């Protein structure tokens, strides 16, 4: 009987500890995007938890934010997220149409940037080059828009 009570207590303590750890490992990720070429439009920031859709399909992002521009920079904050591996992709929607405009070859006509300032060789950068570890503590990224 004592053994069962001790086992139940140990299990309850482990579950409570795991729940507390999970709650503690959530934090806000803020992204500051600078070097925009104008104050026109808005900045779209997408947070990806995997390579699915990265960086061209924001509908597959874990979170998508539209952020205003002031003094040729913008700041986006993502809702609290769990510790883990993520990548961020941002673009300057200069004309405010809610999408990244491209030329007839599929090359962006508006500014883009991804975390780690990763570059692709013949196309968009891969998730593996842009990914970073998020500890769960509030933190920030500073990105410079490229055109």
Which functions belong to the PLM regions below?
Residues 16-24:
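Sec/Tat signal peptide C-region and signal peptidase I cleavage site
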Residues 8-16:
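Bacterial N-terminal signal peptides
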Residues 94-102:
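Acidic, glycine-anchored loop motifs typical of Ca2+
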Residues 27-36, 143:
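A short, amphipathic beta-strand motif
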Residues 78-81:
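Short, flexible loop/turn segments at beta-strand junctions in immunoglobulin-like
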């Amino acid at each position: 009987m004592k053994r069962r009570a001790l086992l139940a207590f140990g299990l309850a303590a482990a579950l409570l500890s795991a729940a507390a750890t999970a709650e503690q490992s959530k934090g806000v990720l803020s992204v500051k995007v600078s070097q925009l070429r104008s104050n026109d439009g808005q900045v779209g920031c997408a947070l990806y938890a995997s390579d699915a859709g990265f960086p061209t399909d924001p509908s597959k992002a874990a979170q998508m934010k539209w952020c205003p521009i002031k003094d040729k920079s913008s700041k986006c904050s993502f809702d609290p997220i769990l510790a883990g591996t993520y990548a961020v992709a941002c673009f300057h929607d200069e004309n405010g149409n809610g999408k990244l405009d491209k030329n007839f070859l599929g090359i962006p006509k508006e500014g883009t940037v991804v975390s780690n300032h990763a570059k692709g060789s013949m196309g968009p950068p891969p998730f593996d080059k842009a990914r970073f570890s998020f500890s769960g503590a509030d933190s920030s990224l500073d990105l410079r828009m490229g055109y």
